[in-house]
Amino acid sequence: MPAPTSTSEIGGPGADEVVIGCASGVAAVNADGGSFLVSEDCARVVLGGNNVTLRVTGASVDQLVVQGQSNVVVAGDVTGLTLEGQANRVQSSAAGAVTVRGDGNTVAVAGAIGTLEITGANNVVSAPGVGAKIVRGDGNTVP
């Protein structure tokens, strides 16, 4: 097998990514635009901003909070995911609980979601299954 040609192939930062540490259990990104990486275990990861790309890889995260507009997040397993805003896209390998407040958000989870709560319109959630769910608003698509 050939050696990786960039650090992004081995889970490290991509050429344009800024690495964010987890100080006192919290990794926070507050920005308008840019690409960021969290790669260490963290109790809480908070993204506040617009047009931000965030990768959360190789890390265990208890709570992932995304606030703002037009953000893109790719994460591994998260215990809880909260989306607040518009037109955000989140992809996760697993999420125990998902809360969406806002409009036009997309959440894709590879595993089943334990609990799902949506307040807003035109949100799309995809997962192979959902335990308990509460959906308020029009035009939402859920499993």
Label each PLM-derived region with a short phrase:
Residues 2-143:
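Extended beta-solenoid/beta-helix repeat architectures
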